[in-house]
Amino acid sequence: MQKGMTLVELLIGLAIISIALNFAVPLWKTDSPKTILAKEQHRLYLFLRQIQARAENSSEVWFLLINRNLATQQWCLTAQVKNNQTCDCLNPINCPKEVYAHFYYPYFPNKTMIQSHHIYPKEITRFDGIRNTIVTRCFILQAENERTLFLFFNVGSIRVKTNQFDSACN
């Protein structure tokens, strides 16, 4: 008799392994606050860089506005061309088309929150597309006890510092 496995034995073994993995992977893939914050931080950073590039290409001043509703745990960002009327990302219907508004809505809206002294209708910062500068400000993105500090510098740079926060941003 030859040593080896039949096709039926191999298929039964694969079925057992796939059933075991089916139960193990969802438990392993649950998002921790650190993972949630890292994903949200990455998406938000890409949005900010996109708006910065848009401001540079348009040679205009763009506002960045943060809005949040603590009662419903909602928050969002609006980027728009400088205008007397500012857009509210929690109520985008009233936003005029001439401001070319771009909205950022969080991937984890109920698990993350944003903190800043400059909440809608005040802008958090301005991207100057002519000079490639940004008004120096900061805000904090938080998921439970994990925090990330977003810093805007007047030389046009955006920095992200994980698990650090500036007392001026609280």
Swiss-Prot record:
InterPro entries (alphabetical): N_methyl_site, Pilin-like
Assigned keywords, A-Z: Membrane, Transmembrane, Transmembrane helix
GO cellular component: membrane
Topology with respect to the bilayer: Single-pass membrane protein
Localization: Membrane
Pfam families the UniProt entry points to: N_methyl
SUPFAM superfamilies with a match to the protein in the record: Pili subunits
Annotated transmembrane regions: 7-27
Protein name per Swiss-Prot or TrEMBL: Uncharacterized protein HI_0938
